Each structure stands twice: as C-alpha cells, then as structure tokens.
Amino acid sequence: MAVCIAVIAKENYPLYIRSVPVQNELKFHYTVHTSLDVVEEKISAVGKAMADQRELYLGLLYPTEDYKVYGYVTNSKVKFVIVVDSSNTSLRDNEIRSMFRKLHNSFTDVMCNPFYNPGDTIQSKAFDSMVSAMMVQAS
C-alpha cells in the first residue's frame, strides 16, 4: 500500500519516517518536507472556516508522476504523511482514512508510554511493526 509513512512534529521536524525501498529514503524525505507547505495551507484554510469541527484528515495533498501524497493532522498539530504509489488505482479514500486512523491510534499508544519523551524520535517496536504492516513489500 504505502511506500513512505512519516510522523512530523508540531515544529515540523520528523519524529518518524520509514520508506521502502530504503534507497529512495532521501527522495521521500524531500517529498514529505515539501508536503508540509500544503498541510499548513490546508490547516489555515480549514481553521478559518470551522474551528470547532475541523476534519483531521486532509485528503490528497498533491499528486506527482509516481506518487500520491496524503495528509492528516492531530489536534496537537502533529502531522502524518502517507505516500502511496500512483499506479495503485484500487486504493480508495476510505482505505487511506483507515490507515491514518490506525497510525493515529498507534501514535497515541506511543505518547501514553511513560518512558517516551514527547518530541523525541519514535523508537517503538509496536509502532514500527504497525507501520511495516502498512508498507508495501519490496520485491
């Protein structure tokens, strides 16, 4: 499904980023970083419209020739970015939402860990295995 999953802190530095294949990691760092401008733009546009009923799922941030970049923002302004392969046309919007819900729930579990310092990079085996389940298997 996903080729890159990233968790970005409120201050826009990566808390977690994972991509397959590993050779493209720098390319995906760039893709995730450039998507943050679109995320900020959507947050400010939605914030002006309805501050109370803000949708956490931002939808498709932007498509590229090879990938589609989707975004999600938590109430604490932590951003999740999922990059999927454009050739995967069977992937529906509700499946992307489901992936973000799983990611958010797993992130909440990490935050509830008393040994995790908020703002540190995420180094949880449970979080990593959940992300691995969402990633496409490199063949």
UniProtKB/Swiss-Prot annotation:
GO terms classed as biological process: endoplasmic reticulum to Golgi vesicle-mediated transport
GO cellular component entries: endoplasmic reticulum; Golgi apparatus; perinuclear region of cytoplasm
Sorted UniProt keywords: Cytoplasm, Endoplasmic reticulum, ER-Golgi transport, Golgi apparatus, Transport
Gene3D superfamilies referenced in this protein's UniProt entry, alphabetically: 3.30.450.70
Disulfide bonds: none
Compartments in which it is found: Cytoplasm, Perinuclear region; Endoplasmic reticulum; Golgi apparatus
Similarity section: Belongs to the TRAPP small subunits family. Sedlin subfamily.
Record-given protein name: Trafficking protein particle complex subunit 2-like protein
Organism: Salmo salar (Atlantic salmon)
Gene name for this UniProt entry: trappc2l
